[in-house]
């Protein structure tokens, strides 16, 4: 079955699919809540399948047009699982196997990965925007019209980290992108009008993409020229992570990529890969990240 699925979907999903221009509404999954779903397959009705549909819908793998999320393992769920598995370099079985369940429960960015629409015949249509590279862009390829950008910290941000600590971390994250591009970033005073605005927020915070508390979605950002970049204030943030701590700088480099117009990448070594390993750092750009920004801005 895995081989058949891989061949059927190769042309549609080996390439990276399109991102929705806004951050996803939280629908993250806890590993313990998924254990009873292992080995579920199309046609089954299993308690908890609706949670998987909610997760896949939030991150673009299940049609937005389907509003009733039940426990029936349907065609759309099978197709969405196959796309998810392809993106995460898993064995494409279209089943809820253990590796797929673990991948779904891994902390990640809140920006959707793909965009799947329901077709007129009831199937799913995978919107493909590129064919070769692993990087991706937001729909319409939005970009900044200038390379000199300002950033500031939002005054209503939850005081998770002092600006004395956060300031140098964010400055280094911006410099990581400046080192490989024509972009130059300058911090301005808190509350001052700026191109990019950074803050920590809890749960629902007015942008249509509520956070989910500890674990799950760590942060999200919006496409150019919106400029919003939000951390989930309830995560265990650190500048030198260990154990269950999440690295502030690694997440910042990723979210700044979104602010500049990059979507998620299929390349696991890329900063723009959607999920994160807690207790570790990942602060350096991969070649795919660099190539993506060059392709978007054509410099």
Regions from the PLM with identified roles:
Residues 2-299:
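Zinc-dependent metalloendopeptidases
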